[in-house]
Curated annotation (Swiss-Prot):
Taxonomic path: Viruses, Duplodnaviria, Heunggongvirae, Uroviricota, Caudoviricetes
Gene name for this UniProt entry: y04E
Species: Enterobacteria phage T4
Name by which UniProt lists this protein: Uncharacterized 11.8 kDa protein in Gp55-nrdG intergenic region
Amino acid sequence: MGKTYRRKDLKVRDYDYFGKRKAPDGVSHKDMVENIFRSDKWRRMKGIDSEVKDELNRQLRGEVRKLKKSVYIDDDFDYNTSQRVAKRKSNECYRYS
């Protein structure tokens, strides 16, 4: 697969612009579109209600608690209690709910 393109690095910040971008040699257009990284955080997105943000924050806090708790409970210790991991999990949880 090809390089991951940040959306902010694209010349035109139109939402559909990455679909119009030509894929590099040896990379299919479908793979290129899937690899484009959207760097917007859900807190900063416009058009999202505060209720949705509150729900995402609640899920995020729950994931952080689970991560910290699992450090002490599991036999194989996992010290990755980063906010990034918890934020990713809460975003996935909201996306598929």
